[in-house]
């Protein structure tokens, strides 16, 4: 017992001997021998050298198992990491698609404005929000259809669904939320616009399938992406003026075929290998000829829409600038250079903006033209009739 008491009193000098003595399960009395004997006749330095790594590892495990307080900002970092794949799924980091979807809506809203008036800012805000939401929903639908195809294409293999960052079930749940938000925006419009807007959903859903069956998926994309050319006018006026909206819509379809064909040339080698079709493959080396034809059709449609709306000089000047912009794109395009194709595709945001500004300025100028128009002269018969109406009737007494 003397040895035990001595060991307990001197544990700060012999930590490893104390650990060995106190953890022994034997019920036999402790022999009165020096502490060095209890641990196998090793010296303090020998014990420390052999057991120190084990003690350090044990301490590390205990410390790592203790709850640690979160660093400032760690919650935001976790939230960012959790939401980043969904933001990538709806292409928040690449807003060009939202712009290209919004501009036909903005054109239609601006064309429908009364002479001398600015376009309806509330409608522009609603359609801008709707473009952001529905473009994201369209990307989700596209990636759900093309998950296996995207995994085989160099440019798209890192997309959240193709790379496995998001499961198919989670993507469907996310799509439901997107469509619900889109419906919430749509119901802010009149009932004619609600029906017209809902009817475009079929095009949005079927577009990704078209690249499997036809070389013209860009045509279907154009029909879906430019639906706002019809919807914008209906939202502000309660009906669609086909004389103005139909040529505007067809112009937008031609524009989409132009810029999305340029876009599709980035992936044409991968598309050939996996059997995906596109206008880039259909046009081939004659791409510039085809794009020139669609550009001419677009400019013709825009001129027709402007004539139907009694547009003024700024509008037609903008149409001319748009034509020059597209001609420069096509002339300098290198269809075998993916970087150049991407650059030309992105520049189409400027096309939409230029035309929108031309519509706004042309509509504002319409009021001045109306005021400066000479009043029609009265004919002699009309003048005599007017004079007789202004004479006071005789009073019979």
From Swiss-Prot:
List the membrane topology term(s).
Answer: Multi-pass membrane protein
Q: Which PROSITE patterns match?
A: UBIA (PS00943)
* Pfam families to which the protein is assigned, alphabetical: UbiA
Q: Does the keyword Lipid metabolism apply?
A: no
What CDD domains is this protein classified in? PT_UbiA_COQ2 (cd13959)
Keyword annotations from UniProtKB, A to Z: Isoprene biosynthesis, Membrane, Mitochondrion, Mitochondrion inner membrane, Transferase, Transit peptide, Transmembrane, Transmembrane helix, Ubiquinone biosynthesis
What's the protein name? 4-hydroxybenzoate polyprenyltransferase, mitochondrial
Q: Which GO terms describe its molecular function?
A: 4-hydroxybenzoate polyprenyltransferase activity
* Function field: Catalyzes the prenylation of para-hydroxybenzoate (PHB) with an all-trans polyprenyl group. Mediates the second step in the final reaction sequence of coenzyme Q (CoQ) biosynthesis, which is the condensation of the polyisoprenoid side chain with PHB, generating the first membrane-bound Q intermediate.
What's the catalysed reaction?
A: an all-trans-polyprenyl diphosphate + 4-hydroxybenzoate = a 4-hydroxy-3-(all-trans-polyprenyl)benzoate + diphosphate
Tell where it localizes. Answer: Mitochondrion inner membrane
Q: Does the keyword Chaperone apply?
A: no
Task: Specify the species.
Answer: Drosophila pseudoobscura pseudoobscura
Q: Which GO terms describe its cellular component?
A: mitochondrial inner membrane; mitochondrion; RNA polymerase III complex
The regions listed as transmembrane in this protein's record are 96-116, 121-141, 169-189, 190-210, 213-233, 242-262, 289-309, 313-333, 345-365
Give the matching InterPro entries. Answer: HB_polyprenyltransferase-like, Prenyltransferase, UbiA_prenyltransferase, UbiA_prenylTrfase_CS, UbiA_sf
Q: Which pathway does this chain act in?
A: Cofactor biosynthesis; ubiquinone biosynthesis
| Extent of the transit peptide | 1-14
What EC number is given for this enzyme?
2.5.1.39
List this protein's GO terms for biological process.
isoprenoid biosynthetic process; transcription by RNA polymerase III; ubiquinone biosynthetic process
Family the entry assigns: Belongs to the UbiA prenyltransferase family.
């Amino acid at each position: 017992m003397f040895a035990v008491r001595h060991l307990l009193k001197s544990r700060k000098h012999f930590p490893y001997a104390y650990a060995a003595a106190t953890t022994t399960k034997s019920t036999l009395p402790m022999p009165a021998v020096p502490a060095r004997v209890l641990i196998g006749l090793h010296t303090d330095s020998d014990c420390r050298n052999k057991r120190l790594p084990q003690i350090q590892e044990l301490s590390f495990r205990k410390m790592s198992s203790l709850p640690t307080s979160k660093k400032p900002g760690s919650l935001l970092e976790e939230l960012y990491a959790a939401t980043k794949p969904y933001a990538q799924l709806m292409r928040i980091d690449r807003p060009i698609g939202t712009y290209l979807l919004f501009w036909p809506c903005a054109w239609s809203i601006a064309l429908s404005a009364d002479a001398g008036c600015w376009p309806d800012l509330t409608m522009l805000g609603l359609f801008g929000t709707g473009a952001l939401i529905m473009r994201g929903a369209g990307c989700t639908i596209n990636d759900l259809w093309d998950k296996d195809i995207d995994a085989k294409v160099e440019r798209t293999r890192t997309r959240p669904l193709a790379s496995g960052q998001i499961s198919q079930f989670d993507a469907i749940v996310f799509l439901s939320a997107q469509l619900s938000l889109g419906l919430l925006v749509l119901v802010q419009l009149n009932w004619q616009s609600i029906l017209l807007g809902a009817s475009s959903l079929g095009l949005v859903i079927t577009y990704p399938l078209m690249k499997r069956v036809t070389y013209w998926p860009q045509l279907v994309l154009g029909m879906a992406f430019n639906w706002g050319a019809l919807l914008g006018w209906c939202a502000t006026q309660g009906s669609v003026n086909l004389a103005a909206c139909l040529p505007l819509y067809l112009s937008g379809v031609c524009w989409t075929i132009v810029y999305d064909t340029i876009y599709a040339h980035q992936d044409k080698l991968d598309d050939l290998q996996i059997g995906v079709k596109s206008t880039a493959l259909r046009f081939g080396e004659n791409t510039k000829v085809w794009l020139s034809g669609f550009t001419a059709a677009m400019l013709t449609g825009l001129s027709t829409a402007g004539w139907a709306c009694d547009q003024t000089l700024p509008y037609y000047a903008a149409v001319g600038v748009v034509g020059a912009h597209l001609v420069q794109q096509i002339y300098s395009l290198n269809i075998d250079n993916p970087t150049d194709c991407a650059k030309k595709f992105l520049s189409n945001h400027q096309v939409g903006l230029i035309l929108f500004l031309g519509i706004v300025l042309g509509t504002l100028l319409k009021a001045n033209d109306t005021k400066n128009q000479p009043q029609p002269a009265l004919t002699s018969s009309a003048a005599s009739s007017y004079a007789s109406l202004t004479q006071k009737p005789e009073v019979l007494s």
